[in-house]
Amino acid sequence: MLRVLSILIILLTLSCAQKATFREILGKDTVRARVELVRNPSHNLAIQKVALRNLKDKLLNPPPDVKLKLKVMKKEGKLQLTEGSNADLVISMELKKLRYEEKRYKTKEEDMDITYFCVERQATADVLFNVMNAKSKEVLFAKVYKGGFYKRYCDEKGYKSEKLPKPDFIKLKAIEDAEEAFVREFYSLL
């Protein structure tokens, strides 16, 4: 019984010693991250998969102002995306809400006596991002980011919705807006 107890204590101390804190992970020269999608069955899976691919691209190629800040702070190239189990961090993305709306209305210009037929398409998205330690599953931060996208087209001759991007494109752009907000905050942690 004493041997079993001593072996358990040794295993427990070894497992605790292997867990790296976030400060240690972020202090490394290179941080390996695995990006995962938490699927939401109430939304189109194809849009979610494309959004995940766009997130990976945005993490590897952040916006120009973020890139400049990383270059100045000498932290460029610090993040590497990996698919295996050798990741330091796990970044998960879950689409919580996706709202799409299309409106048609007439508007009149009084001074020129012209009636315009307008079509509006807009989408808003709420996306939950979790960043956690890959080994201990300890959460660094979890936050819902909101994104939106809007397009309108007006014509004198009638409603021309074909002049606007497709609804799936509008939805994807709303998700990308939320992703960009996440990427900016994520790189501020590095």
Curated annotation (Swiss-Prot):
PROSITE patterns xref list: PROKAR_LIPOPROTEIN
Top-level taxon in the UniProt lineage: Bacteria
Protein name, per record: Uncharacterized protein aq_1277
Annotated organism of origin: Aquifex aeolicus (strain VF5)
Lineage: Bacteria, Pseudomonadati, Aquificota, Aquificia, Aquificales
